[in-house]
Every structure is written in C-alpha cells, then in structure tokens.
C-alpha cells in the first residue's frame, strides 16, 4: 500500500521525467531485452534493434500507462482495467515480466535522475511499480 509520502514521491519523480517519458520507456524496454532475452518472445514482430521505431513506440505506450497510473494512483485498478484485460487475456504475458520491466525502469530512472533518485524515492517508485504490476496481473486469476 502506498503511503501519502510514497504518492508524493512518485508524483514528484514522474513529474521530473516530463517530456522524456517515452524515451525512458523505450530505454527500459531495451534494457529488459538485453538483460532478460526471453522477454523478446512477446515481440516477435518487432525490430528490437537499438533505437527502432517499434521499441520507441512501445516505450511510449509503457510511459503513457505509467502516466495514467500516476494520475490515478488512488484508483489504479479502474484506470488500468483495459490494459490488465489486454495483457491477461489477449497477450498472455507471463506476470514475471512486469517485475523485470519494473526493475529496468528503476535503473533507467536512476541513471537519468541521479539527484532525485534518493533512497526514499527509490523505495516509493519500487512500491508504485509493484502496485502497477499487481493491477496488471489481477485478471490472470
């Protein structure tokens, strides 16, 4: 459960991401594909090379979903319901992959926002991404 301090930390940190959200989303995906090659199996139709338009496009989708979650932090299940349905029923993404992407997002944010990435912000973002992952996997059951 996100505390009021966690929610503030997440909103402040995501606000600093600003116009780079899509770029950071794509970078996190690239990190995931390189670090966890089995995740590539969900994207057989993508050009997964560095800087590809498809990875950038999906990175923007990831970032947009996170922006939506930040904006609806008190009602993520409702806000992310369609995305949860998509990943559970159509795409059938293994839930462990959300944890892998979350880790890569944290690494990416730490690399780009070192001054802002304090231990408290790190913990809050980790809890937030775990909450997003829980919502996205809630319809698997």
Curated annotation (Swiss-Prot):
GO cellular component: blood microparticle; haptoglobin-hemoglobin complex; hemoglobin complex
Domain Globin: 1-141
GO biological process, one term: hydrogen peroxide catabolic process
Modified residues (Phosphothreonine): 8, 108, 134, 137
Keyword field: Acetylation, Heme, Iron, Metal-binding, Oxygen transport, Phosphoprotein, Transport
Similarity-based family: Belongs to the globin family.
Assembly behavior: Heterotetramer of two alpha chains and two beta chains.
Protein name: Hemoglobin subunit alpha-1/2
Record organism: Macaca sinica (Toque macaque)
Lineage per the UniProt record: Eukaryota, Metazoa, Chordata, Craniata, Vertebrata
């Amino acid at each position: 459960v996100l505390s009021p301090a966690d929610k503030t930390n997440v909103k402040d940190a995501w606000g600093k991401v600003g116009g780079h959200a899509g770029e950071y989303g794509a970078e996190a995906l690239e990190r995931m594909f390189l670090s966890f090659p089995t995740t590539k199996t969900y994207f057989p139709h993508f050009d997964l090379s560095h800087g590809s338009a498809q990875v950038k496009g999906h990175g923007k989708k990831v970032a947009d979903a996170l922006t939506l979650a930040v904006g609806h932090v008190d009602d993520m299940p409702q806000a992310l319901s369609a995305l949860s349905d998509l990943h559970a029923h159509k795409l059938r993404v293994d839930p462990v992959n959300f944890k892998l992407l979350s880790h890569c997002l944290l690494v990416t944010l730490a690399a780009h926002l070192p001054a802002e990435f304090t231990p408290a912000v790190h913990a809050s973002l980790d809890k937030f991404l775990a909450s997003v992952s829980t919502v996205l996997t809630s319809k698997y059951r």
